[in-house]
Amino acid sequence: MTDLTLDLLRDAVAGTAAAFRCVTDYQPAGGPGDKVFPPTYEGGKYAEEERVDPITGEVVRCVLLDSVQSQANRMELALKDALDAPGGPLLPILQVEFGGTDLSKRITVTSLDAPHRVADAIFRDSLIDEGDKRVPFRHSKKGRVLDESDLRNATGLLGLCPTALLFGLWDSTGPRGGLGAKFQRAIVSEIVGYGAVQGKKTASRIDPLQIMKESAAVYQTENGGWTLSEDLARRDKGKPVKVGKKGEGRPSDINHGNVPPSISGGGYTIRFARQTTVLSLPAVRRLRFPLPDSQGGTVLAEANLEARAVIVALGIAAATLLREQGADLRSRCQLVPSGSFVWELLRVPPAESSTYVVNGAQAQA
């Protein structure tokens, strides 16, 4: 199996290959048959659906273990960890700092953290130093790059926030509204559990103090705390106000007392989980990177090739670094790979596809 090099990436981008793909199967860290807990969505629901089992060809029940959006966020954070490490790679990012404020802790948000990347409202509503004054980011030279960016001219965005060209961007809150810059995701990844069977989960709490419901009534105080004294309680129309949404003043409303054991649906056993990552080369080839004062021709073609290769390399690096961090998705949902991480270059028939290996160190080189 061949190492994946930058020259191979350039050849793939310059040719007609369809995509780079990495498919990895997993089992729960507790072993086959151990229960895993998927993410919950509104109403405490799991994302279940029927899919064709890629191994048996049968239609089976599946559950989503990590969504496309979540995987993109994890890849961005994997890149951020690499950038923060000593001797890490260099990558253009935006960063806004909330220093010199009354916040209890200092907060820093980068374009690898913000949900909408460089087009996020956090950056839109921030100030940037330009010359001898501070101006709103979108009114600055860097901010106006978004106004000028599209598929035919992504040069400025490549220098400002290249991950936006990889993970996708829609500048829907900018001055052009819904007509703002829009770039599709070039890389898509998700983890799905196949052969999913829902189980049960239990919940309870034993209070070592054995505080009973009838022990006392609990009242609100003016400073947001609680008290057992009516005299110290916050009052509404002359009456002491009890804690709790229903105003019952129970000890359980301030997290004391036992919680009776309960049983509900929760967790799944699965036959296996599969992580599928696809990096679309046609999506990258749609991007154009004109140079200032360029007359086109050979210079433009070379600029397009190099810029596209950078985006593909960035995607390979992000996905590889994420896999090497491990698949500990959330509490009670740790997965262990069943094999090595292999990238496949999907070529258009009759050309044959090729497989490659790359590790995190190589991906960052």
Regions found by a protein language model. Give the residues of each.
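Short active-site loop/helix that positions an aromatic residue
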Residues: 71-81
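Extended catalytic/binding region for NAD+/ADP-ribose chemistry, centered on the ART fold
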Residues: 62-72
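Basic polyanion-binding and macromolecular-assembly surfaces
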Residues: 1-38, 42-63, 83-86, 93, ...
